Amino acid sequence: VPARDIYYYLTLSTIPIMILWVSVIIAQAGGNPFSALRDANVAEVRGIRTAAFFVLFWMVSYIMELQVVSRENIRRVIVLFIANFFYAFVSMGKMNFMILFLATAIILTERKIIRIWHLIIAFFVLLVFFVGVQKMRGSYTNPRHFTALYLTTSLANLDQNVEPSTAELPAENSCRLFYAIKSSLDGGETPVVDPILEFQWVKIGDLKYYSNTYTTVYPFYKDFGLIGVVGFAFMLGLIFGYLFKTAEDGSQFSLVLYAILAGTVVMQFIGDTFFMVLSQNLQYLFAALLPYIISKYNLFANTFARNG
């Protein structure tokens, strides 16, 4: 299938670029190299930002190969898994590990290759990874503290520190993408909300935590109050309901996109990872849709036939 080949060889050709970037960042890191890698994932460090557009194709390529995993393509699957794991590691981003874990679990469950007890074991392994990533970044190292921070503080943080309908600009959180586009066009004059939210103290019983998670309703609640929460919840329900239904009906495109975006559903108790990073999700949409356009219209078929 030409589309799968194109994505696979695109991945192979861009892995050396990522390795070079990571080598430069680590070589020039003044302190904690893992912290420097994290900084390079969310903003440029000496002109380098590891959150490159091409890594989206790595994930889509991995899922497409995993959908048809067999003895014939198992090497590809392993190479692509290692590539995506490598990126998740060097990005020092827990969400990237989550996407890789969930995408793998969803596809293998759909293929009836793994069972529930496999998922339970994998979940605890993922939790260990999360604690390890947090420790390497120089943040919280206590597993109990880490678990409590992410499982208990979000709702309390929303209740204690966020007032409804208090956004400085209309829909600046829910429609962040439009402000980002406007900012890029006017030379940065339009302010854009940082998707990494502000840390604030949260009191739970006699304990206090320093947290920047507010559950998935934060952008809608802050922009529009309870009406926004209801409206955007309905919108998300339609989107994910459609993807799930069409994936169940056999749409491979919907299955790929659902596998990638499933983290949005799982992470709702922590924060919104759909609308506030809509630009990235639209790029995933493009990367997931392109192979099926290539296959449907036999794009590049003549090129592969000549080279074959």
Question: Predicted regions span which residues?
Answer:
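Hydrophobic alpha-helical membrane segments of integral membrane proteins
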Residues: 94-102, 117-120, 231-232, 278
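Small-residue-enriched transmembrane helix-hairpin modules in multi-pass membrane proteins
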Residues: 36-44, 129-241
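Central hydrophobic cores of alpha-helical transmembrane segments
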Residues: 76-86, 119-127, 237, 255-264
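Short alpha-helical linear motifs
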Residues: 104, 123-126, 142-148, 255-260, ...
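Hydrophobic alpha-helical segments
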Residues: 209-308
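Juxtamembrane/interface motifs at transmembrane-helix termini
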Residues: 118-120, 136-139, 250-253
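Alpha-helical transmembrane segments
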Residues: 6-13, 50-54, 76, 119-123, ...
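Membrane-embedded catalytic interface detector for glycan/lipid assembly enzymes
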Residues: 1-114, 127-141, 305
